[in-house]
Amino acid sequence: MMHGLHSEDEASSPVDQSCFPLTIDFSLANPSQGRIILFEEGTSLRGYALLVPYWSNEFGGTLVVVDELFVTPMARNRGIARTFFRFLGEHWPFEAVALTLEVSPGNTGARRLYESLGFTCRRNSLLTYRFPE
């Protein structure tokens, strides 16, 4: 499914797919630093979210980054992501003060969903510096 997200997301940086198993292994071994939540309907996997908590001085508490959120195309518009955010608000194991996420400019459906849930745009831009290998 990680392949699906990164193949659809035109705004995403190129991703080395060999990182996918490393991310899964790290999240399983270090749940306080990353969690993967799977979205299931019956016995079918319909999507996933990758969550990364960290302390934010600006927010005065734990901020949870929804680093990746993907619902399979055939399962979209069925309330899966909305249900996930409701679940997250009720069952996140750490005391969090806010959620943050990125959305691709062309993903208007996801943006509408996030705004309907109360997410707002920040004035700051996200910049990234990648360390040389």
Label the predicted regions.
Residues R82-T83, P105-R123, F131:
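Conserved active-site alpha-helix within GNAT-family acetyltransferase domains
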